């Protein structure tokens, strides 16, 4: 049997006015979570403060550095195929956010992903029998991801599943 907390992963969910930090074990169980009110700002000071809070979270929960597998950062925005940059992020005004803004301050491997696709990864992890699904992420802004053949469908330009931009009423208000 695997010792569930022999290694842990840290998940960061960045929203417009706050961010969440979560520690999960090798089975995907949540160990600790914290929500920090902190408005997003594309500034070096923002990234430094967020990464300082991540390090503080790890220290407060008494995790040795060698236990940390990595840090996954989920945000509202379409990421590049190599997961290094937010290519389109009008909800939070985070177009151009780069993974290196976080990783330069953290001694762990880091990964950047669209928040809806991160939710779909969790569904696949928790439900290995899941073959095809549409995942809806319901928060202030609707999001979605498509799972086919046990894979998250990316689409030709990483836009697959971004149902938040489906036009329901052409005469209605604009998204942003």
Where are these regions (language model features)?
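Acidic surface patches and DE-rich sequence motifs
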Residues: 25, 80, 169
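Hydrophobic "anchor" residues
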Residues: 30, 85-86, 152-153
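Glycine-rich phosphate-binding loop and adjoining helix at the ATP-binding site
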Residues: 34-132
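Active-site/binding-pocket entry motifs
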Residues: 20, 77-79, 172
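Hydrophobic residues in beta-strands and at strand termini
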Residues: 2-4, 38, 75, 138, ...
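Glycine/GP-enriched mid-protein hinge/lid loop-to-helix segment characteristic of carbohydrate kinases
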Residues: 33, 108-176
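Gly/Thr-rich phosphate-binding beta-strand-loop-beta motif of the actin/hexokinase/Hsp70
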Residues: 2-33, 134-148
